[in-house]
Regions:
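An N-terminal boundary/leader segment
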Residues: 33-93
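Immediate post-signal peptide segment of exported/extracytoplasmic ligand-binding proteins
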Residues: 101-117
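Short glycine/serine-rich loop/turn segments
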Residues: 113-172
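Intrinsic low-complexity, disordered N-terminal segments enriched in polar/charged/small residues
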Residues: 1, 15-18
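Hydrophobic, low-acid, alpha-helix-prone terminal segments
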Residues: 1-9, 27, 31-34
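Long amphipathic alpha-helix in the N-terminal Rossmann-like dinucleotide-binding domain
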Residues: 92-99, 158-159, 168
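Hydrophobic face of alpha-helices
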Residues: 2, 6, 66-70, 95, ...
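Intrinsically disordered, low-complexity segments enriched in small polar residues
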Residues: 21, 26-27
């Protein structure tokens, strides 16, 4: 189903609903627009924290996985209208997984190395339950039943998949 975005471009929503939103068919900004949207704000540690600093902050109890997922979603919301870098979001699932990791950190269990870290996956990698289009409108309704090997390993290491990033059609 095509739905208009606030800027008048098209947005597609598949069977999984809004929690698995797809943002195909949007204009990509010029380098100047991209720079104004994100880089002019400065790429500070606060705006663009490293994976290591995020994991350390969670281990010290200064940040939660839920905080990091929400911050990631906010940053995507700020920059993506210009960048069109993220084409599918899995907000509800990511927040549910983040809450589970937050509980695990509180229990002080032995945790996997990426426990609670928000990540984005290229759209040419199958992600169970999250739309995988291969960058093609032909696959807008494809929701895999299994993860690709790399996604399976990331999840096993504790990563929280927030969404999928744009690629050229079929990665060509």
């Amino acid at each position: 189903v095509l739905q208009p975005l606030p800027d008048g471009s098209a947005n597609t929503t598949g069977a999984a609903g809004d929690e698995n939103r797809c943002m195909h068919q949007r204009r990509i900004g010029t380098p100047s627009e991209i720079g104004q949207a994100c880089y002019s704000q400065g790429m500070s540690e606060e705006k663009c924290p490293t994976a290591v600093s995020q994991l350390d902050a969670m281990k010290r109890g200064e940040r939660s996985s839920t905080d990091l997922v929400n911050a990631s979603l906010q940053r995507i919301g700020e920059c993506n209208p210009t960048l069109n870098a993220v084409i599918t979001l899995a907000e509800e699932r990511a927040l549910t997984e983040a809450e589970a990791w937050d509980r695990a950190y509180l229990d002080e269990r032995s945790l996997p190395p990426l426990a609670g870290l928000p990540v984005l996956i290229k759209d040419n990698q199958r992600t169970e339950g999250i739309r995988t289009t291969l960058g093609s409108a032909r696959h807008l309704d494809t929701i895999p039943q299994h993860d690709a090997g790399i996604v399976r390993r990331l999840r096993a290491a504790g990563a929280v998949v927030v969404g999928k990033t744009n690629i050229p059609e079929y990665s060509i």
